[in-house]
């Protein structure tokens, strides 16, 4: 499942970036497997700022339908909020 998530993210990053983003350049940030389904958040540090390609992929597998969906996002902001 983790290998498939990285493989699918790599394919989608490569398609959107117009160049090869290797599977080994992708890493799983989060993973969950409820029942026959699973979801992984995958990222890469190979996307340069300014490239028109997201750097986070959400891979969702629907085990009942035997389908896997790939959504790609771009991190827009990251800031610390003090308690």
What are the residue ranges of the model-derived segments?
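Short, non-transmembrane alpha-helical segments in secretory-pathway proteins
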Residues: 1-26
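Amphipathic alpha-helical interaction segments
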Residues: 21, 38-39, 81
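Amphipathic, interaction-prone secondary-structure segments
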Residues: 26-67
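A short, surface-exposed interaction/processing loop segment used at functional sites
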Residues: 63-83
